[in-house]
């Protein structure tokens, strides 16, 4: 793992709102969850080529909102992985979807798995609570 300077976490909003410290940083992630869910609902009602690539993207957007919200509840190096993991889970299928639409449908489909696979690496190095 690449070490992160602990000063990185001092940007977090320090105000309390609705009983939550870092309130605006936490609550500002709700739109990601909403947009991701809306995308999944939209996909369910439309015939979209490579729909599963775009479904993976929208799941990643939901995970971005949840992971970033979790990180901002208590900003620390130990929770930062959840903030970044959601984003990379959205980026990989997004790029695979662009490749599928602009280069080759089969190439985009084949690339989703290998592009998502590196996301599993940080999970093996998460710090254990004692």
Which functions belong to the PLM regions below?
Residues 110-111, 118-130:
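Terminal transmembrane helical module of multi-pass membrane proteins
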């Amino acid at each position: 793992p690449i070490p992160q300077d602990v000063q990185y976490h001092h940007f977090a909003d320090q105000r309390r709102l609705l009983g939550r410290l870092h309130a605006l940083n936490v609550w500002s992630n709700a739109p990601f969850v909403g947009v991701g869910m809306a995308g999944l609902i939209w996909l369910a009602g439309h015939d979209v080529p490579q729909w599963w690539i775009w479904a993976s993207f929208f799941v990643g957007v939901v995970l971005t909102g949840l992971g970033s919200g979790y990180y901002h509840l208590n900003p620390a190096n130990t929770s930062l992985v959840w903030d970044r993991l959601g984003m990379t889970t959205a980026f990989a299928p997004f790029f695979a979807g662009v490749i599928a639409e602009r280069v080759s449908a089969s190439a985009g489909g084949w690339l989703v798995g290998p592009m998502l696979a590196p996301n599993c690496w940080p999970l093996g190095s998460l710090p254990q609570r004692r």
